[in-house]
Amino acid sequence: MKISVAIPTSSLQDESLKIDKTRKISVLARACAIFKIDTIYVYNEGNNGSDGSFMTMILRYLETPQFLRRRLFQKVNDLKFAGVLHPLRIPSHNTPTNAKKIIAGDIREGVIVTVKGKKFVDVGINQLIQFYGKTPTGKRVTIQFKEGYPRLSVKEIDNSESKTYWGYDVKERSNLFSLLSEWKGNIIITSRKGKIVTKEHLEKYTKSEENLLVVFGSPEKGVHEIIGGRMNKVQNSKSLNFFPNQATETVRLEEALLGTLAIINAQK
């Protein structure tokens, strides 16, 4: 079972400064990496569309290994405060730069470059490796070494072939209802209006082979308010309250994400 999350663009509206928005997204990314989230869906909610593209860029930037960022991201204003971001330190990021330590079977992230008409892959070892895969120049790719040092030949693979958590995808959605109505799998809607979560509730999902989508509302609207009367058209969903008897008026997204995923993870 793979777990994905859906979070609203409006979750940044509580922060007025871009540096604070950047820090908040960093916490969200860390929470998703800790609990091995497969895909982060950023759905549009509210009127500030620029927050959506900003959130998406920072989430993708954080998930990208540090040694590839210079090739994949231009210097733009949205990355002005990248220095405050906390690194994810997931397995795809923790790779040695010494080519002599590479052995057959190692998996890495790289970016495709073209030199004199030939394609190479840069995997952060201060030398380019010839590449014969289909990924176009300028794009990120997952490779596996067929031969270690000194021959260093590689093949293109799907990142799902890694035996360890390799990172999350980030996808934008224009609205939440389209995501929920098209989702193939189980859905948990986090809500104060839901049933208080129990071990029995969660085991139905954690023991299932179906993928799970965990949905979070906005600072001003819960998921039921966002969806409105179309809620009954959402299949395989259940509303659960992960914070019963909360003392605070609201639970911020970063708090809800960490708390909810920790509870789900404990039942896996």
Predicted regions and their residues:
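Post-transcriptional modification and biogenesis factors for structured RNAs
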Residues: 1-268
